Amino acid sequence: VIAFLTSITEKAGIKARYLHQGMTSSDVLDTSLNIQLVQSGKILLNDIDQILKILKRQAKKYKYTPCIGRSHGIHAEPITFGLKLASFYEEFKRNRKRLVDAIEEISTCAISGAVGTFANINPNVEKHVAKKLSLKIEPISTQVIPRDRHAFYFSVLGIIAGSVERVAIEIRHLQRTEVNELQEYFSKDQKGSSAMPHKKNPILSENLTGLARMVRS
């Protein structure tokens, strides 16, 4: 923030003295971070809506398609593939609600100056910023927005990543040669291996599994 202000000051001249008046770096950084998290969360909500739409459609399509149910990876009792997809659908419905709650939790701003006392800035400035950015004001004045808000937001991302991984691992298991109950989409000219052209590897599911672990970490 200091480097940014210095750069602006060199170009704006004497009026630059008002640019950061009464604020701290935390006012700028915490508020801008929360804006980014809110906007990112809305992108994820749209993605989850697409996932829900597809899972619902496919669950209905395959509601009478029999497959074997497994526990501990071992054949148990018959189920339908639609039931399996319906389970994924309900899980992502819960994830959507969690994400909505997380976005609401992180939608706050703080423009209250050093240690949050408004000593050198009018509280109306904070109200104006909150209204402009569609954020809420922190209920208790503070310099640093409490990190439990961020912890909740990122824990929800970890849960969503876990759900994505659960679907991906299921696809990987069902695509194994000795199982061969399910396959990722494989285009006509797609190659599975440079050395073994007969292979159809679940690359997308493998990538999703790896990315989910990175999110949780």
Task: Describe the role of every protein-language-model region.
Residues 80, 113, 141, 155, ...:
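Conserved short-loop catalytic and cofactor-binding motifs
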Residues 146-217:
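A conserved active-site cap/scaffold subdomain adjacent to cofactor or substrate pockets
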Residues 126-143, 147:
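Active-site-adjacent "gating/activation" loops or surface patches in catalytic cores
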Residues 1-112, 118, 123-128, 137, ...:
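A helix-coil-helix interface module used to build multimeric assemblies
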